[in-house]
């Protein structure tokens, strides 16, 4: 009974890593720096309401930021987002 639970936990963890790890790698430069423009939108942990902008891979899009946490793909204006993330 204990072995079956352990194997299920290992399988679940393996699947979770297979899904999460490629997304993290795709946001990383060859020198190890993270390209914030490739990170997904993240509204953070709080329940406040701030309209912010994130780069979705093509353009800058509005989203609601909760005020705490999240990631660095978050800009106060569309102009700031485009300046940082849009490719010329």
Curated annotation (Swiss-Prot):
Any GO BP annotation: envenomation resulting in negative regulation of voltage-gated potassium channel activity in another organism
Gene3D superfamilies per the UniProt record, alphabetical: Pancreatic trypsin inhibitor Kunitz domain
Localization: Secreted
Site (Reactive bond for chymotrypsin): 47-48
Signal peptide as annotated in the record: 1-27
CDD domains, alphabetized: Kunitz_huwentoxin (cd22598)
Pfam families in alphabetical order: Kunitz_BPTI
Record keyword Disulfide bond present: yes
Tissue and organ distribution: Expressed by the venom gland.
Covalent S-S links between cysteines: 37-85, 60-81
Propeptide residues per the UniProt entry: 28-33
Residue(s) at site: May bind Kv1: 39
Top-rank taxon, per record: Eukaryota
Annotated SMART domains: KU
UniProt GO cellular component terms: extracellular space
Alphabetized UniProt keyword annotations: Disulfide bond, Protease inhibitor, Secreted, Serine protease inhibitor, Signal
Family annotation (InterPro entries): Kunitz_BPTI (IPR002223), Kunitz_BPTI_sf (IPR036880), TFPI/VKTCI-like (IPR050098)
Domain BPTI/Kunitz inhibitor: 37-85
Listed GO MF terms: potassium channel regulator activity; serine-type endopeptidase inhibitor activity; toxin activity
Membership in a protein family: Belongs to the venom Kunitz-type family. 03 (sub-Kunitz) subfamily.
Role: Serine protease inhibitor that inhibits trypsin at a molar ratio of 1:1.
Name the UniProt record assigns to this protein: Kunitz-type U15-theraphotoxin-Hhn1a
């Amino acid at each position: 009974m204990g072995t079956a639970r352990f194997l299920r936990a290992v399988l679940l963890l393996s699947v979770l890593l297979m899904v999460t790890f490629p997304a993290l790698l795709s946001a990383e430069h060859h020198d190890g720096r993270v390209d914030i423009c490739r990170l997904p939108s993240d509204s953070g942990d709080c329940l406040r309401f701030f309209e912010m902008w994130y780069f979705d891979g093509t353009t800058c899009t509005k989203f609601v930021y909760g005020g705490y946490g999240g990631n660095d793909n978050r800009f106060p204006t569309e102009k700031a987002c485009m300046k940082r993330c849009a490719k010329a």
